[in-house]
Amino acid sequence: MKHCFVALFLGSTAMASVKPLTYYQDEWGEDGDDLREALYDIIRVHTRLTYSSSSTDTWDVLKVSDADPTNATNVMLIYAGIPVNGPQEYNNNQGWTREHVWPKSLGGFGTSAGVGTDVHNLKPCNGGLNSLRSNHEYDELGTGGSPVNFNGSATGSRYNGSAGLFEPRDDIKGDLARIILYMDLRYEGQGGEPDLILLDSLHSFCNSFSLISSLFYFHFPFSFFSFFFLIFFFFVFILF
């Protein structure tokens, strides 16, 4: 079930990566399981940070990675889409929190150095919206569910608590989809790490996240051009 994400991962990196071509040279010519293993070997080596400490931690990285492009002192809140002062951090829930895009409870991990502090999976978030999203999986809700508001204004997100579903606002759907796809590829159950698996059925079992079809849709803006990429990746998935 994991093979399709290799093609999707490569497609997104080929179009968006600023790394030299040599970064992925070890996987050229590979396919299927061999390709997935080659990519895993490349991305599994990275700096492990502590969740919170007096030295460089995940707070510090998010202040840079998610800085407001118009004011670097602020960070952008992922679901609200507005800036907030970065240095204040949590500040008794008056500041911001760190959202695990792949929820801890759906991955069997906490906040120990490793998967729980992988900043690829962390985003600044308002505490209330962090709690509202909870561990809901991502899907398109259309006009269903309820709108997500922040400070009296609509954010563009929606949620359905009884169904355990959350639809992010359009501007961030692609980013969140690629984070989830990265987590599926990066965490394979090696060295005591969890084996994270993407599925297309909701609430399947521990260490899984859904829905594949919605993440594909989130990743590609649905235009004439991207339609052919979407068909291509589904074709590759079937072949694998």
Show which residues each predicted segment covers.
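Short, His- and charge-rich active-site/binding loops that engage polyanionic ligands
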Residues: 75-77, 81-95
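Domain-level detector of nuclease and nuclease-like folds
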Residues: 90-214, 222, 237-240
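Sec-dependent signal peptide recognition
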Residues: 1-7
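N-terminal signal peptide c-region/cleavage motif recognized by signal peptidases
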Residues: 11-13
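Short alpha-helical segments and helix-capping/turn motifs at coil-helix boundaries
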Residues: 56-64, 82-84, 106-111, 163-167
